[in-house]
Amino acid sequence: MRILLVTQMWPSAAEPDLGSFLLPLRRELEALGHEVEVAAISRRGGSPLKYARLTADAVRAARRWRPDVVFAHFLFPAGAAGLAAARAAGVPLVVMAHGTDVANLDRAPPRALTRPVVRGAARVIANSRWLAGRLEARYPGLSCEVCDLGVDLRDFAPGAAPAAWPGDGPHPRLLCVGSLIERKNVVGLADAFAELGRGSLVFVGDGPLRGALEGRPGVTVVGRVPHAEVPSWIAACDVLCQPSLVEPFGLAALEAMSLERTVVATTAGGPPEFVTREAGVLVAPTDHAALVAGLERAVAMPVPNRAARVAAA
């Protein structure tokens, strides 16, 4: 099968972490014998005209390459670009929602442009039952497939060489992987860590809240790293923390569990669907006392935590 993958997030040399979760998907589709071509945006920021260019690129690829199906990631704007490409080639559109696209549906442009995508797609996929429920409530009559992208257990296998922990910081070593934005609750995590009163906390990622984290005692911000380096960072930590205000799926938590690491994850979104009591601690992200208590419980769990990998598999 010839698959045209359309997305507004795809890694590049300049931004190796952008949409890196899609790389294993392409690899596995090709391993199954499918041909995959990508129409994508590979940088953050810039003019909104980049979305028009994505649509033009996707339509050109569809007309030139003649795929059997268009597979768009994110309802908007990639979904709209994918719908145009599918119509140009006369083939079905499959679109996958990842979370931020659904959160943006209360804004006028995404709301107006997403409805025809949902109605015109042969299949709509959500990465968690929680996200599927939100979509189905918004679009009566819609029946979402639920299929997360998962984790390749070969890439996130116990025994990965650990990264050098900044300053050889003390245990317990806590790690947070992701964008440093309000939704990820990174400041709340740093505040809870300060109240924990011991250990070290490393953030792998970047974003507008970096300045609110740097300079705190025991806290280091490493910045963005290629996705291939994430297993080494997880292997170096004792606990992976993802107490987001909302997390539609929670890929970083699943990756950590695959590497036998305990996780602290949010109750808001997808993590309750796979984080078991033996694998980690679920906390209400806006409850500061619960987050502090969750960190206390998590750092008392075994390292490595073999039950976490069992749950991830």
Q: Locations of the language-model features?
A:
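Short alpha-helical donor nucleotide-sugar binding micro-motif in glycosyltransferases
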Residues: 224-225, 232-237
